Amino acid sequence: MFSKATYTARREELKKLVKDGIILLFGNNDSPFNGPHNGYAPFRQDSSFLYYFGQKRDGLVGVIDIDNNKETLIGDDIDIEDIVWFGSVHTVADMASEVGVAHSAPMKALRTIVADALRQHRRIHFLPPYRYDIKIQIMDLLGIHPNQQKEAASLDLIHAVVKMRSTKTQEEIEELERAAVIGYKMHTTAMAITRPGLTEKFVGGQIDGTANSYGATTSFATIYSQHGEIMHGNPSMAELQDGRLVLCDCGGETLEHYCSDNTRTFPINGKFTQRQLEIYSVVEKAHDYALELAKPGVKYMDVHFGVCKIIFDGMKELGLAKGDTEEAVRQGAHAMFLPHGLGHMMGMDVHDM
């Protein structure tokens, strides 16, 4: 968790950007793994809730009343039976105090807060929900059907959150650097142990274990597959074959939930064939070009299409494409070899903002 001052400053900036009304930031709830009585999936807090309220516990809602300059952390304290299973945890009031929030209230108070705001015809801001339990909660509070909630979400709040989360502070950059180190260790672990005869699943497990061993977790489900033509190929029980390439797409998430994401392709037996090396070298050239060009003030699309042209030129040299490169890229022919964007923003979500 960052300092109390960090979360306080973020909420103050958010209030200035949104200007008026009440902001509801829903934290996530525990999600059953495969049944209500059979364990729970590892809990991951909503990133925007984390950004402004910092707490990682389930079942919380942050309320920011801009007009009355009042902030409240909503949630129920655990009871004695919960303590038997989960141990003693901070009260909601304690958690509020940790992040500079002066008020706390049980979950039943949220209905009263929202009802009062609706009665006064005040603006109520929420972000587009992505979990169905939160969609039901919003429907229960605001009477908005889940199918209509994306359109009903506050554009002012969306723009403000995107603006703030898109620009990283120094402490966030340090977290991203930590995430990059974890990702590096995951990839080098994969490279070190990959060899013919192992299964994709085994190596994938070692990759995930590396992330966990550094006190973190994976930032998304690890992709490790000999079928690099399938962009999101999960590790299977297939044996690694001598002479083939394997694609590894993985990343780590720090304890503060900042993410890394890198993709590398390498030979299973440690040595490229001539053809593999030729194609790899085209990708490496494009990679180095992007690193050299990308800097503040340069448009992402200029870097993306510059890379597309390098790749198409390379494919022409290898006899895998033909035609005028400029026209081919304009018509989208490069998508035969690069069927996706060059990259994406990083932050608390692996595809940030």
Each predicted region: which residue ranges?
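Active-site neighborhoods and metal-handling regions in enzymes and metal-associated proteins
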Residues: 1-353
